[in-house]
Amino acid sequence: ADQFGFNEDQREQMAELLADENNSLWSQVLYGITGGDGEIVTVALSQVGNVGGEPYWSWYGFSSRVEWCACFVSWCADQCGYIEAGVIPKFAACASQGVPWFQERGLWQDNSYEPRPGDIIFFDWDDGGQDGQSDHVGIVEKVENGRVYTVEGNSGDSVRQNSYPIGYYEIYGYGTPAY
């Protein structure tokens, strides 16, 4: 504010606009995100382009690189306070930790579900045959025209935006956090 020469009234207005309770408004303005939870999507989008995932796997507690897609989702959730609040689990493994957590709480939908922003999308990649176990995870950014748009960590060893048709055979299902 100093570098722009804001007066006291302008500083107060800026502080009001940037207050936490306006995060969903800014998600709508900046990213077109409505419904669901825009806060975790905003955090995830801010990380697009990261290569190697070091901030996420090291935050989780690993001392060297691991398959870090779940660490990325957990890190984003932690930035929003969702792990501490019990809204999303801290997990590093999709099949043994992430999926069961949502299923046990009745917060699970199969791949025919039309997701909302902030839902957690799990995949069962067809790399040598699907095994009925989730092996990748991301965050739903939005749904438009029958496609689900995602932000995924460890997608080609970076944070990337991707999209898939709703009901795509490699989508294992969705965790639907109770935001």
Segments (PLM) and residue ranges:
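Non-catalytic extracellular/periplasmic "stalk"
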Residues: 1-30
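Generic alpha-helical secondary structure signal
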Residues: 12, 35-42, 96, 100, ...
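Residues that form generic nucleotide/phosphate-binding pockets
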Residues: 17, 43-47, 101
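N-terminal capping segments
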Residues: 22-82
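Aromatic-residue hotspot detector
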Residues: 56, 72, 122, 173-174
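...with weaker cross-activation on analogous glycine-rich loops/strands in unrelated enzymes
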Residues: 83-157
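Active-site signature of cysteine proteases
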Residues: 145-179
